[in-house]
């Protein structure tokens, strides 16, 4: 009986003192977003709309809007909803799912990880991006409408635009640059938010915040600055971290007063594959919400949003805080389009063109008309030709979702493709793949001839290939390393097969990392590890049955709180032999190969074992070599 709860601070002391159940009898509502009249919620295999008809903060009805989202691996299901400036929202979906959703515009299918975009105004679902990501639980938009994401199961953070070229079912977009600063890789990440609050120091505005819930238990803060077509990041600091081993920060958002709210799932068990669904240690009562303030700076005085007039809501769009503008745009969509559009036009006419924030205000006005499903043509053209490339790039995004409303769409895209700034050109290139007409290739060609960089070259080539019906040749993501010469032909074949198993999603590289160096303090390295190149029986046992609890390796302590997955039920004896042969002859290790017969013998000898190994018990059976 999962619920959506409303917490209120009625006396302004910074602590919740009122709880309202908006909706109950739900099952795993792992994504939701507000819309006029209610809330969209993930209820796999459905996307449902919970309507509050009388404004009493309680859902009165439930409508299944779409169905067919895969649910057989629930923690990969549609989640972490994030609204774009129009009010359409992105939905994250993990790698192990195969969704087939019937929509008014035809079926939408997704596989192998990616993002959907649902537009409530049009009841339209789109598979916006398809690429090699494992399990995304974080998505965020910056003040200019550019979107960013985290991979969760891996340590990667990406700018989303380069991944949004239209593709065929099951065909992934080429990988793009990882924005995670060197030395700051953590996993599993969850929740993503840009700092946009006058309550926080000026120098950190625009920084990005991401939470992590295993190993490093806290929140990373990185600066994000423009860098050519794309961006570059730098580690700012850890905004907070905890020594409570059950602390699990999973989401965060800025409040109307500029403070930051953080959701702590707070659970001793975090592995879905390692623990029984009904394990009594699963914690259903200790979830928390924290509020973070900056004591030496005043809180932001909240502006009126709920119940405000159209004119007041438009004035709110001048506020510096992203979340204030987000909530004001959402409130504007509650009003009739026949009243909002004339008010927007009047508001734009009243703006001071000499105001440094004029370009952004112009863009906000365009976004309001987009959200009303009535894009203002004059506003769009003003933004497409604005002197600020951020505005021009954002305007191309608006055009990309409104092709059919402008007879000169192709000409507008061509002009954007010839823009002086690479970000505008990349927006035009990605948009052209969705234009889906032969003439769209002209747009990509113009952009390529104008110039590409590390952010756009591969993506532009892929866009051209797809528009010509070609299958782009991708570089091997995890190239085969040199095979040790001392192995026999049979062992070399085993090493090669083991390399592929090592990099399977949810297998070895997920925790121990691609380079075998692990992630302190949760995931130990395989690099030069006595547990890998030492006694083969010990290694086979922990691979078959998993490992839990603290232990020490090469002078470092690992908490072992999240158990190593027991692979005995996931891999057969040959597969285990292959991947262990690979690990024992890679990452600085050099040891004998493992045969399937060795695995079979150990499996038979330990078939009565239940639960995980603990290192102290394993070492009693197989002491470390001296």
Where are these regions (language model features)?
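Electron-transfer interface patches adjacent to heme c in soluble/periplasmic c-type cytochromes
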Residues: 506, 525-541, 545, 549-553, ...
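Extracytoplasmic/secreted proteins, especially bacterial periplasmic and envelope-associated proteins
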Residues: 312, 327, 339, 394, ...
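Extracellular/periplasmic ectodomains of large secreted or surface enzymes and adhesion receptors
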Residues: 180, 184, 236-250, 254-501, ...
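Detector for the c-type heme attachment site
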Residues: 294-295, 511-519, 544, 548, ...
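Short cysteine/histidine-rich zinc-coordinating motifs and their immediately flanking basic loops
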Residues: 130, 519-525
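Flexible coil segments in periplasmic/lumen-exposed cytochrome c-class electron-transfer proteins
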Residues: 472-493, 553-554, 558-626
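Beta-propeller domains with acidic blade repeats across secreted/periplasmic ectodomains
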Residues: 1-313, 331-333
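Sequence/structural segment immediately N-terminal to covalent heme-attachment motifs in c-type
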Residues: 491-519, 532-545
């Amino acid at each position: 009986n999962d619920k959506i709860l409303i917490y209120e601070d009625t006396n302004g002391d910074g602590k919740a003192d009122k709880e309202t159940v908006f909706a109950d009898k739900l099952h795993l509502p792992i994504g939701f977003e507000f819309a006029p009249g209610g809330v969209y919620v993930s209820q796999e295999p459905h996307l449902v709309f919970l309507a509050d008809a009388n404004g009493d903060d309680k859902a009165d009805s439930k409508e299944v809007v779409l169905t067919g989202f895969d649910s057989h691996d629930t923690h990969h299901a549609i989640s972490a909803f994030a609204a774009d400036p129009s009010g359409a929202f992105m939905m994250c979906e993990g790698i192990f799912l195969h969704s087939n959703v019937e929509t008014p515009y035809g079926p939408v299918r997704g596989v192998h990880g990616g993002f959907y975009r649902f537009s409530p105004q049009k009841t339209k679902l789109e598979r916006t991006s398809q690429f090699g990501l494992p399990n995304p639980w974080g998505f965020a938009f910056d003040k200019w409408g550019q979107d960013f994401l985290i991979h969760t199961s891996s340590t990667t953070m990406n700018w989303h635009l380069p991944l949004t070229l239209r593709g065929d079912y099951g065909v992934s977009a080429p990988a793009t640059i990882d924005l995670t600063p060197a030395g700051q890789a953590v996993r599993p990440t969850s929740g993503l938010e840009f700092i946009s609050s006058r309550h926080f120091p000026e120098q950190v505005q625009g920084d990005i915040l991401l939470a992590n819930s295993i190993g490093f238990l806290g929140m990373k803060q990185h600066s994000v600055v423009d860098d050519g077509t794309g961006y570059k990041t730098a580690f700012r600091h850890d905004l907070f971290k905890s020594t409570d081993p059950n602390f699990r920060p999973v989401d965060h958002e800025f409040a109307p007063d500029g403070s930051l709210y953080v959701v702590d799932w707070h659970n001793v068990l975090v592995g879905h594959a390692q623990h029984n669904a009904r394990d009594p240690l699963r914690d259903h009562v200790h979830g928390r919400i924290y509020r973070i303030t900056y004591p030496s700076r005043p809180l932001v005085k909240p502006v009126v949003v709920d119940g405000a007039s159209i004119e007041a809501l438009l004035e709110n769009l001048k506020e510096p805080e992203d979340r204030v503008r987000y909530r004001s745009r959402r409130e504007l969509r509650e009003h009739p389009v026949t009243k909002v559009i004339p008010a927007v036009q009047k508001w734009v006419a009243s703006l001071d063109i000499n105001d440094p924030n004029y370009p952004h205000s112009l863009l906000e006005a365009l976004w309001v008309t987009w959200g009303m499903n009535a894009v203002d043509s004059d506003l769009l053209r003003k933004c497409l030709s604005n002197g600020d490339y951020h505005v021009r790039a954002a305007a191309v995004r608006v055009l990309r979702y409104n092709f059919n409303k402008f007879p000169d769409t192709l000409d507008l895209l061509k002009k954007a493709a010839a823009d002086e700034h690479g970000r505008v050109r990349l927006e035009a290139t990605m948009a052209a793949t969705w234009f889906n007409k032969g003439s769209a290739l002209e747009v990509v060609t113009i952009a390529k001839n104008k110039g590409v960089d590390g952010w756009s070259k591969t993506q532009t080539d892929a866009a051209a290939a797809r528009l010509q019906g070609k299958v782009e040749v991708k570089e091997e993501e995890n190239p085969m390393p040199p095979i040790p010469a001392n192995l026999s032909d049979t062992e070399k074949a085993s090493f090669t097969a083991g390399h592929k198993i090592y990099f399977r999603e949810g297998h070895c590289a997920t925790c121990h990392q691609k380079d075998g160096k692990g992630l302190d303090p949760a995931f130990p390295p395989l690099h030069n590890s006595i547990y890998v190149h030492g006694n083969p029986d010990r290694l086979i046992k922990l691979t078959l049955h998993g490992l839990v609890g603290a232990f020490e390796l090469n002078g470092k302590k690992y908490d072992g709180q999240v158990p190593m997955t027991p692979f005995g039920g996931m891999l057969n004896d040959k597969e285990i032999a292959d991947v262990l042969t690979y690990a024992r002859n890679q990452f600085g290790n050099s040891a004998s190969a493992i045969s399937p017969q060795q695995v079979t013998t150990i499996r038979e000898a330990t078939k009565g074992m239940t639960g995980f190994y603990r290192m102290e018990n394993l070492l009693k059976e197989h002491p470390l070599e001296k």
